[in-house]
């Protein structure tokens, strides 16, 4: 039955209780009998500062090329229509006080789910434990926070359907709510101003506070300055830290406006501030003068804003750690001393820089009272300063496409668009390296770039590089060239213009690419130095390539690359590498080739619709230069009956895959490999991961194995942490390792997000926000089960020895029993049939125990709500799993092993060995448990065929000979090979671990 509102409010925090009150008011206003999840969504979308509202607006801005307000309005309409469909209750005229509509069972179930999720969340695990210990006398009720309340509401099937009708995905909304981007808390401010509406005469007055202000190029006020002023006027967290590539420009605009006496954008209570700028690098150069500098700052007048500039130097290794720590502590003490009259302001170019700063100084945001302020756009925009028509849309917005898409000239693009944080870091590294050693490019920085981005140094310039340290003018003359170089690289590659060039018509490939059973294609080339086998999925074409007219459709594609002349002289140094690379001008802008490369390389390509494979560092040079054939032979020997899967895995791991298929929107070079192993054969998948650990990581000590099925069991490894937390801790201790993740489809939503993020960025983030580098790590993720299409034929015939029975075989001792033939004929067959019948009954009971049951103690509504919740969670997991499999470096499907055929071969070999000792006239009975044990040992052995033959000759054959000696020649007898259920097998001490070390003769 429904729950009273007062009872439900006791389980919520103040913020969540206010959201529930808004939902109750919506239900009361519509005269609904109960308060449901839809009412809660309606109330959250109405609140101006709601997390759900900001996330939806931010997600709409990223998903649609149109106005984000239109899609958000569509969501509001869908919610309103769904609420209109709910029946209204008729209030009695005798009631004088209107009662609150009680909380429905579905909404109360969402609150309970929120409590469970929040209780087991690692971030609050220790806090709940301390809270429970301090309140032992009273029963403590876990207060549900608003974030977890929203996550549970989004799991409601009705809410998911409404969001889907409006063009949203509940999984995306949950992702943004659980791990919001840096800009999420301000999305309601800048998203509405990122698109300037049409200019009407009625829009010109700015008396309405909620109206968007137009950022005219000649205006005195700047939107970013106004936002900075709002932060400075706060009581807490009043020191803004500008985050973004445009943060430096916004900071400069703010300081220039203050210095010119323009305070119109500041609130009245802080009007009249003064700005004092300091350069952190100059202060840190002489550590002894830090105290003197801060003494001077302490004597300044009140109302001062201390401009710290770019804070990247605090996270770098240029200066001593002790000096930087002293500087940070001095600033914190200065702020505590003059809290009411002193402000800080600074900027970082990217979120990564801020995370590095937090990693080095975890409490700097509290000590400096920082407030993150994202700067997503420049005040100038993409329009020239002299153009008023840049923000004007003719005909009242009827032709809005002209304002949404403008093609700026190349000169304006070069002036207004800054470099991205990656190119900016590379530029600064080159400047630092050139200033220190006189080298134009740092070797470590250059090796991380593809060969077509490496700078070319002419020979006649080498003599002038030694003058850098002596003459500072040389460095000053080099800096503009470096700036132009990286501006060109960034704008050509990382910053795509609004329209492509008219001379280039993008066309997507019209043919599917497949590899075996994994939807991939092989491209084979000539000799070992010219052979490249490339794997590519159909979704790998993130960029668009120009195709020739009427390309021939071929199922198998071959590409031949002629061997350059200069590589013949270097053949001795390249024989160990299975790859040969060529440099091709892809029309991406200025090409910077390496020094040892010739300007042109002859290339003969039969199919021009493939991109040329580029060089990439994977794990290490020696690691991925392993011979493909050697790895394939090793895996084939250790993992039998999976030849196609072994070939595909060897190709992927050895680097025979398409470089452009790496993570979407992933610029930085990652050197980890992600494999997805689908289908059955659990033992074969694990043996593949163990073999990769032996080959690439030096042994099984660097093998990390986790199972998402065991996260709910009593496993000490996961106490107080999640599976991803355990993986992050192990990878931090063992950098070069193979991570084997079983049943990845069982991962919970937070772990799903972290795994997807680690695959994109190359860094695994635990539940506490710490990032662990996944460099030099091979991740092998398995998915239980297999495709339905590939398993349809398996269900046609009953299977006697299934994979589940084989892997669950007991570790019983094998025995050879000698019995009189008469007794065997009387008792043997009946007893054997009885034992087999008992085994079938046990398996049938186990199957029945796994079926769902009906709990009569639960109301019908709650059972239906739980079923809907389970269905929604399963649907969300399937969607994430499909995306996860498509993003990995390679997916390989294992086929089902015919254990029945293997059992026949095992029986045939045992009988042949038996007849050598007893003769063909003697009968041997073999129990099913014996076959199951041998099958399990055979599948888990390192070298299946060799190990089984060795066990037959060294263990079973001597036992048969010993049994033959005990037999009485005159009396008729029969021999049984059984598995003793009384005594389990002891730990093996021989080299054959899985097979029994001895077979008893009774």
UniProtKB/Swiss-Prot annotation:
Placement of sequence motif EAR: 854-858
Q: Where is this region: Repeat 2?
A: 103-185
- Enumerate the subcellular locations listed in this protein's record, separating them with semicolons: Nucleus
Annotated GO MF terms? ATP binding; ATP hydrolysis activity
Q: Which domain of life is it from?
A: Eukaryota
Q: What is a single Pfam family found in this protein's UniProt entry?
A: AAA_2
Where does the Clp R domain lie?
Answer: 8-185
Induction field: Up-regulated by strigolactone treatment.
Q: Which InterPro entries match?
A: ATPase_AAA_core (IPR003959), Clp_N_dom_sf (IPR036628), Clp_R_dom (IPR004176), P-loop_NTPase (IPR027417), SL_signaling_regulator (IPR051650)
Any idea which UniProt keywords this protein has? Nucleus, Repeat, Transcription, Transcription regulation, Ubl conjugation
Q: Which residue stretches belong to region Repeat 1?
A: 12-86
What GO CC annotations are associated with the protein?
nucleus
Q: Please give the tissue specificity annotation from the record for this chain.
A: Expressed in axillary branches and roots. Detected in seedlings and leaves. Expressed in the primary rosette buds and expanding leaves of adult rosettes, the vasculature of the hypocotyls, cotyledons, and mature roots, and in the midvein and petioles of young leaves.
Tell me where it mainly resides.
nucleus
Maturation and modification: Ubiquitinated upon strigolactone treatment. Strigolactone, but not karrikin, triggers rapid SCF(MAX2)-dependent degradation.
| Role according to the record | Probable component of a transcriptional corepressor complex involved in branching control. Regulates cotyledon expansion and lateral root growth, but not germination or hypocotyl elongation. Promotes auxin transport and PIN1 accumulation in the stem and represses BRC1/TCP18 expression in axillary buds.
Family named by the database record: Belongs to the ClpA/ClpB family.
Checking PANTHER family in the record gives: CHAPERONE PROTEIN CLPD, CHLOROPLASTIC (PTHR43572), PROTEIN SMAX1-LIKE 7 (PTHR43572:SF54)
Assembly and binders:
Interacts with TPL/TPR in an EAR-motif dependent manner. Interacts with TPL, TPR1, TPR2 and TPR4. Interacts with MAX2 and TPR2. Interacts with D14. The interaction with D14 occurs in the presence of (2'R) stereoisomers of strigolactones, but not (2'S) stereoisomers.
The entry's protein name is Protein SMAX1-LIKE 7
